[in-house]
């Protein structure tokens, strides 16, 4: 068969297909939905996990330090000198890699931006060329050296319109002119987006881990991560064993956080994102599988429809290839159109998902389609369509040629084809059950989380952050005075009832600190500096003693308030009057405070996590060393409680009030406290959004598939139904028969899907909160919805079977 003849045959098949736009549209849309879901999730996977970091030889990049969260390392500047001497390293750098607020100004305009800090070795080790300017030099990385800043490409474009002459200019950073020495390349992946890098001048004698530095290193060629990890452990254990701060509690802490080396990609990004993204991909693959099953059913029915024509052509001597070309041509066209439509839907889906997927998962960038994602879509769509066409061809070859010719084209839905159709329906229903149970369980999880008391009242409260400009508010006393004046002025703004300030809002952030109880061993606790009204703004209840008072000022007795869980866990429920101590400078100096009150517990991270023991210290009593450490973490949180019935103060009124008492002091955007609380369940909402969307698509496709199979089966059995009607069978009996057959398929699919869901219970359980996979409410709802949807899909074919005119069947005889 010549190529020209093959091409003619394919074009003829496409013209024939175009004359049936309904079938073509249904097939393309079915495939597009499956391709879109898998492509969108593959794009997330590729961006987060699969695509190598754009640094030269990224497999040689590691972080060194003590294990912190799963998959993360943390280090102190004092570790840097000994780590630099490790023989396994080619280069090394240090950074404070989590963005913190920084106040920048150009002329009269000021704003808060996100900044990290790093030494010259950091960018040198990563190895990316600058878009403009240069890296920090060694002089700028020494204590007492000149200040410098490197801009992110995005900030350079926004703030300087991409002007190359911005390099060499000065930018007001924290009230001090700082020279811009370089611009980062457009693609600079990091865990969280930032606007600028400030030059870091580490104190190489400091071993305090509270500032969360990371040490990035490039391994020498041929050195494995395991070998570097072993050398890191030996080096840091020797350093820490000889530390003057090492005691039994420190040593126990070291055993829980062993020193090691971790690949940069693993230690930069959220360790939980990989598991969640693979879960999403599995769910999306289920949708593609259902779409493939539906497409197979459609193309099989299409093949059966031309079976008589194929039998005639075969009898006239047509080759197997020529008989297969129409189905293959249709598969190619449907695959191409479905892939392209799926790509468009995936692109739209990623744009809509941008605000839901954490940037930390996506290397600090918004989700987008890559070249690999486009290739994946084309391969997935093309392969699915061709496999569906191939199955139709194989099933068509099994039909008896003589029987087909004798039937005159009335052979229709054979016993074997009918059995295959039922199997495909059962498979679709089973897959839909698994996805719907997942969506129902995530819904139940969100319901349970919403019922958990956070320990504070978020209604009528708004928050914003303010970082005192460092060059104007240098000391702790300066910061306290600025805070006092701003609070006093804000309380005069109409609509504001109370104003409180703390180092952290009640939830969505953590600040861990080591606390010593009555001179005994240290314990881990959450730590907050707060003004007197902060606890009142959020109505955190006072359980015993008193709260923070206006009289708790510098020079007076140092006091603190502890949470109920702190009192119960560490003070045996007898907290009042006890003495707790905090490290004042990361070393031997400690600040002792008397416990004067006990307040209710607060869930600092999310409703899924238990309340953590917490110490609240009056902001006015913070020590100078403590302030210098804490301001490195960023800003103070101002909480404003609005009067009942008041419309509230808008952001412009707040900014104007602050400008009166603290000129050129920028603040971050105002947000309702309820929005901050809602963000604590963002991951669970993302789970529900995606799995729920996939489950809805699966339900729709399964219902369409059941309808198609039942409709064709009824059409193929019209003669049978007509004869039975002629013999006296009432329409209700024929209806019940068709619905009963559909019910059997649905029931088998439900049981099979339920069994698969139970088999996956251990995998699903990690994503649930106070809900079991075998939750009767979730399972009952899923079974009811699927059974109803399936029977509704079968209702139209059943009614058609009951309406077959008896005379039509008799005339056919």
Describe the function of each predicted region.
Residues 115-138, 146-276, 351, 438, ...:
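Mid-to-C-terminal secondary-structure elements
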Residues 291-335, 704-746, 750, 800, ...:
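Interfacial "coupling" helices/loops that link adjacent transmembrane helices in transporter permeases
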Residues 42-46, 50-101, 212-216, 260-262, ...:
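Membrane-proximal extracellular/periplasmic loop immediately following the first transmembrane helix
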Residues 1-26, 54-56, 67-70, 109, ...:
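Membrane-helix entry/capping segments
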Residues 33-60, 350-359, 431-460, 763-773, ...:
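Alpha-helical transmembrane segments
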Residues 20-48, 290-292, 339, 421-445, ...:
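Short, strongly hydrophobic transmembrane alpha-helices
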Residues 1-25, 264-270, 299-325, 329, ...:
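Alpha-helical transmembrane segments of integral membrane proteins
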Residues 41-44, 296, 331-401, 444, ...:
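Small-residue-rich transmembrane alpha-helices
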């Amino acid at each position: 068969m010549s190529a020209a003849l093959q091409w003619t045959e394919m074009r003829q098949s496409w013209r024939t297909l175009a004359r049936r736009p309904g079938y073509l549209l249904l097939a393309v849309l079915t495939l597009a939905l499956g391709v879109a879901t898998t492509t969108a999730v593959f794009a997330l996977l590729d961006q987060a996990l699969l695509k190598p970091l754009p640094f030269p030889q990224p497999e040689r990049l590691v972080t060194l330090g003590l294990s912190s969260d799963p998959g993360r390392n943390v280090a102190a500047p004092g570790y840097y000198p000994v780590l630099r001497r490790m023989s396994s390293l080619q280069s090394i750098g240090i950074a404070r890699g989590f963005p913190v607020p920084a106040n920048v100004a150009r002329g009269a305009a000021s704003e808060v931006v996100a900044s990290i800090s790093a030494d010259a070795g950091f960018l040198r080790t990563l190895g990316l060329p600058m878009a403009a300017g240069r890296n920090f030099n060694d002089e700028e990385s020494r204590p007492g050296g000149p200040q410098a800043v490197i801009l992110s490409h995005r900030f350079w474009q926004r703030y300087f319109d991409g002007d190359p002459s911005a390099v060499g200019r000065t930018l007001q950073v924290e009230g001090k002119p700082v020279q811009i020495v370089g611009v980062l390349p457009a693609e600079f992946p990091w865990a969280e987006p930032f606007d600028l890098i400030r030059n870091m001048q580490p104190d190489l004698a400091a071993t305090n881990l509270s500032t969360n530095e990371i040490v990035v290193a490039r391994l020498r060629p041929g050195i494995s991560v395991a070998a570097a990890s072993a050398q890191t452990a030996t080096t840091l254990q020797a350093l820490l064993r000889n530390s003057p701060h090492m005691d039994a509690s420190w040593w126990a802490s070291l055993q829980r956080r062993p020193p090691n080396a971790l690949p940069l990609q693993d230690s930069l990004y959220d360790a939980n994102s990989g598991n969640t993204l693979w879960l999403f991909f599995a769910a999306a693959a289920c949708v593609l599988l259902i779409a493939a099953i539906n497409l197979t059913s459609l193309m099989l029915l299409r093949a059966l429809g031309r079976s008589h024509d194929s039998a005639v052509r075969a009898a006239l001597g047509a080759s197997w290839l020529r008989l297969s070309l129409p189905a293959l041509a249709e598969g190619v066209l449907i695959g191409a159109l479905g892939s392209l439509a799926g790509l468009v839907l995936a692109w739209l889906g990623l744009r809509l998902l941008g605000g839901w997927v954490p940037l930390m998962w996506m290397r600090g960038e918004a989700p987008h389609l890559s070249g690999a994602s486009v290739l994946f879509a084309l391969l997935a769509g093309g392969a699915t369509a061709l496999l569906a066409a191939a199955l139709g061809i194989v099933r068509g070859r099994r039909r008896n040629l003589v029987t087909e010719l004798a039937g005159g084209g009335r052979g229709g839905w054979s016993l074997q084809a009918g059995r295959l159709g039922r199997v495909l329906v059962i498979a679709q229903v089973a897959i839909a059950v698994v996805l719907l149970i997942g969506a129902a369980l995530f819904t139940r999880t969100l319901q349970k989380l919403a019922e958990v008391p956070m320990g504070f009242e978020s209604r009528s409260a708004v928050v914003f952050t303010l970082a005192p400009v460092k060059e104007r508010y240098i000391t702790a006393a300066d910061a306290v005075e600025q805070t006092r004046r701003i609070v006093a002025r804000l309380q005069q703004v109409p609509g504001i009832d109370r104003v409180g300030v703390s180092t952290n809002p009640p939830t969505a952030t953590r600040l861990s600190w080591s606390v010593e109880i009555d001179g005994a061993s240290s314990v881990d606790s959450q730590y907050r500096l707060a003004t007197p009204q902060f606890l009142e703004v959020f109505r955190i209840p006072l359980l015993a003693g008193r709260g923070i008072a206006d009289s708790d000022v510098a020079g007076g007795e140092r006091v603190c308030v502890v949470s109920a869980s702190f009192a119960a866990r560490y003070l045996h429920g007898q907290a009042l009057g006890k003495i707790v101590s905090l490290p004042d400078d990361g070393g031997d100096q400690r600040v002792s405070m008397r416990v004067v009150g006990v307040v209710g517990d607060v869930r600092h991270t999310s409703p899924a996590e238990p309340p953590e023991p917490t110490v609240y210290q009056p902001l006015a009593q913070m020590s100078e060393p403590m302030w210098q450490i804490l301001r490195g973490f960023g800003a103070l949180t101002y909480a404003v409680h609005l009067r009942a019935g008041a419309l509230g103060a808008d952001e412009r009124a707040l900014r104007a009030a602050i400008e009166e008492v603290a000129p050129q002091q920028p603040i971050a955007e105002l947000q309702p406290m309820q929005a901050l609380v809602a963000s604590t369940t963002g991951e669970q909402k993302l789970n529900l959004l995606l799995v729920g969307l996939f489950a809805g698509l699966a339900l729709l496709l399964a219902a369409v598939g059941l309808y198609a199979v039942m409709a064709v089966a009824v059409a193929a059995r019209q003669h049978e139904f007509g004869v039975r009607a002629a013999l006296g069978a009432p329409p209700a009996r024929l209806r019940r028969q068709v619905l009963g057959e559909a019910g059997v398929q649905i029931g088998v699919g439900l049981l099979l899907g339920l069994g698969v869901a139970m088999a996956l219970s251990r995998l699903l359980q990690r994503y649930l909160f106070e809900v079991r996979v075998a939750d009767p409410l979730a399972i009952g709802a899923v079974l009811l919805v699927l059974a109803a949807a399936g029977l509704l899909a079968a209702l139209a074919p059943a009614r058609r079977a009951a309406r077959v005119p008896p005379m039509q069947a008799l005339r056919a005889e």
